[in-house]
């Protein structure tokens, strides 16, 4: 018996996490195995437990459950440092990761770069693993190519949160240069739950033409169909080198050309291999250098 256990509580993250865990659930059912969401007291120690966090997996391992599978969404210790937490949290999370990953029956990674990161950091060799990039759309919306605004206007978009590693400030600097040098009118659309924070940053950057809204997943697709270019800029740090940002699937599904940093290694390599259309900005090479190794000419 397989059991999927999550303790995610943040609304936005919970929705995305549920999407991925549902895919794992359906794969197990299609394989002819029994699977259920959630925990029940007295579950046999022989059950295989699937987690989306190492710290949760460790709790159950300490209770005697040895058949564990972990889906690793991000490198938590390094993310903690980027969020400004103390070094002790980094070391605590690293110890948890090391203990859990060494004993897992299977590890699900977001990218091959993430697997390489863990193998190097903890001197591990994963024999049983699976790579499932982060995404929330897996088919092309043909309506996007029938939207005249996509071809007639130069609309740019940024979607998602404003965490430090998402480089929203640097994105605005790049867009400002585009706005100043474009021979034709340009528009920036920002879809985020952090509307007031985004508005302050945009006004600080003195962007002229912009629109800020929050859209749920079901509404976002229609809004993206009119967009031509989408930003996914990242600082050249390990958190980003192992990442496969969800917004890339949104962009590709709606015919949007990604403007992305080449430090998103897995996506960059895939795009090169498939000869896909791209505007790749080399980290550290795109005149105003800041503390996160960006240059914006």
Enumerate the language-model features and the residues they cover:
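Membrane-proximal helix-turn-helix segments that form the acceptor-binding/catalytic region
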Residues: 76, 87-109
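Donor nucleotide-sugar binding/catalytic pocket of nucleotide-sugar-dependent glycosyltransferases
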Residues: 102-120, 124-143
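Glycosyltransferase donor-sugar binding loop
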Residues: 159, 186-199
């Amino acid at each position: 018996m397989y059991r999927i256990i999550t303790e995610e509580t943040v609304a936005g993250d919970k929705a995305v996490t549920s999407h991925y865990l549902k895919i794992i659930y359906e794969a197990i059912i299609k394989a002819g195995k029994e699977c259920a969401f959630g925990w029940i007291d007295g579950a046999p120690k022989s059950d295989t437990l699937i987690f989306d966090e190492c710290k949760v997996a460790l709790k159950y391992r300490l209770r005697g459950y040895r058949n564990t599978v972990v889906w690793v969404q991000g490198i938590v210790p390094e993310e903690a440092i980027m969020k400004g937490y103390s070094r002790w949290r980094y070391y605590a999370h690293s110890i948890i990761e090391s203990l859990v990953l060494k004993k897992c029956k299977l590890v699900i990674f977001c990218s091959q770069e993430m697997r390489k990161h863990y193998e190097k950091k903890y001197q591990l060799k994963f024999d049983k693993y699976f790579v499932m990039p982060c995404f929330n759309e897996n088919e092309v919306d043909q309506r996007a190519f029938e939207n005249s605004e996509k071809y007639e206007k130069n609309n740019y978009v940024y979607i998602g949160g404003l965490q430090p590693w998402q480089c929203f400030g640097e994105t605005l600097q790049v867009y400002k240069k585009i706005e100043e040098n474009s021979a034709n009118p340009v528009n920036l659309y920002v879809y985020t739950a952090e509307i007031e924070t985004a508005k302050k940053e945009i006004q600080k950057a003195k962007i002229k033409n912009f629109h800020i809204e929050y859209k749920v997943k079901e509404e976002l697709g229609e809004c993206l169909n009119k967009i031509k270019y989408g930003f996914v800029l990242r600082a050249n740090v390990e958190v980003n080198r192992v990442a496969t940002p969800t917004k890339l699937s949104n962009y590709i599904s709606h015919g949007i050309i990604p403007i992305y940093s080449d430090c998103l290694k897995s996506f960059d390599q895939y795009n090169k291999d498939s000869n896909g259309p791209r505007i790749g900005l080399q980290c550290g090479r795109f005149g105003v250098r800041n503390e996160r190794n960006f240059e914006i000419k």
